[in-house]
Amino acid sequence: MRLITTTNPDNGMAMIGRYPLLPYRPAPEAVRAWLQRPPGGYVVADSELGWTVAPGGRTPDGLYQANAEGARAPADRSYGERSLPGRLRLVTVGDSFTHGDGVGLEDTWQRELERRRADLEVVNLGVPGYGTDQAYLRWRRDGARLNPHFALLGIWPEDICRNLNVVRFFLQPAGGFGFLSKPRFIRADDRLQTLNLPVLEGEPLVRALIDPLNSPLLRHDYWAIPNDLELHSWQHLRVARAFATVANLYRRRELRQRLYAGTDPAGIEVTVAIAEAFARDVRRKGAVPVVVLIPMLDLLQRYAEENSLPLAQALRARKLDVIDLGPPMARLVHERGPSSCFAADSHLSPEGNRWLAGWLLDRLAPWLDAARGQPGG
C-alpha cells in the first residue's frame, strides 16, 4: 500500500492517487508556503469575493483574458455604464460553466448569443470555481454598475455544495483552489447573514486550517466534518489512513447526492435564498432577473424530465423565473452521447456551448422581444 501513496509537493500532505489522506489537516509551513506563492495572472485572491478574475488579466497560454472591468472579453473592449444604442445588455454571473472553462472566448455561450442576435450585448462575469454566493456578490459589486436590461444567474448543481462551504480545501481537498476561503451566507430569521467577509487570509487562515476544530467560523462549513479533521492513534499507519480515505470519499459522494436530491435540504434552501436576494437586487436596478440552471453531466439521466431537478422545483416554488437547460441536454446526450456536449473534464465543449446558447435564446426570446418594445429597449 505504501507504494501507491505519495506526498503532495504543494501542501506536504500524504496522498492516495490525487486525494489527500485523512485527517484533512495540512502542516502550517505548507499553508504559509502556498499563500506566499506569486499571484496568478488571471484568477487572483479577492478580500470580498474569495477570488475573482483580475481586471486586464490573462492566462499564460492566452486562452482566457479579461478587460479592464474584469469581464471575460478582449482587453480593448469596454462596456461602460450603459449599453450601446439599440442593444439589450445581459450581465451573466456564475461559475466555470458561465465563465466558459476549457474553451476560447469565441466558443462561450455568451458570444454565441451575440452572434445569433445582433441586438444583444452579453457581459461574461463568470469566475471559475464560484458558488452562487460569490456570483451574487460579484453581481452586487461588479455587475450592477453595468446597468443591464437582464441579469442571468448561472447555477450548476454542484454550486449547492459550494454554497455550504467556507474554506475550499475542506470541500475539495484535491481541488485546484488550494487553501482559499470564500464568503458564506447562512439563513437567520428568514434573512441572509454573511459570514467570512472580508475573507480569511494570512495567519488567521493558517490557524483555521491547522486547528479547524477550534475555529468558530468553520462550524459553519458543512464540509469541515469533525471526523475528517480529528487525529486518531491509528493514523500513524499510512495503510490505515489510505483505506479510511477511500471509504470517506464514498461517504462524501453520498452527502453530495443527498444535497442534490434535497434529502438534506440545507444546500437547496440557502441556494434558493441567495437566488431570491439576487432577484430582488436586480429588480431594484430596473432589470429582469433570470436563473439559468446549467446541466451537470452526472445528474442528467436522473433528472432528465422537465421540472424534475429538486433545485428547479424549489426555485419555481418561490416564483423565480427559471430556465432549466438540463432536460434538452439530457435528450441530446441520450441521442448522441456525452461527447456531443461535454469535454473530457465534464465542462461544456464548444459544441455544448452552442447548444446551450440555442436553448437559452429560445426561452429568453419572449422577454427579449418584450424589452425591445419598451422605451429605452
Predicted regions and their residues:
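Histidine-centered active-site loop/cap adjacent to the catalytic His
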Residues: 1, 321, 342-377
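Membrane/wall-proximal cationic-aromatic binding patches
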Residues: 5-117, 139, 223-256, 309, ...
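Conserved SGNH/GDSL esterase-like catalytic core that processes O-acyl groups on lipids
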Residues: 72, 89-91, 97-188, 193-194, ...
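Alpha-helical scaffolding within the catalytic cores
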Residues: 76-77, 135-143, 273-276, 307-308
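Generic structural signal for small/hydrophobic residues in well-ordered secondary structure
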Residues: 95, 135, 151, 282, ...
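Second-shell loop/turn segments in exported
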Residues: 96-100, 124-125, 264-268, 342-346
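Short, amphipathic alpha-helical "lid/cap" segments that border enzyme active or binding sites
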Residues: 132, 136, 268, 272, ...
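Serine-dependent acyl-ester chemistry module
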Residues: 157-315, 320, 325-338
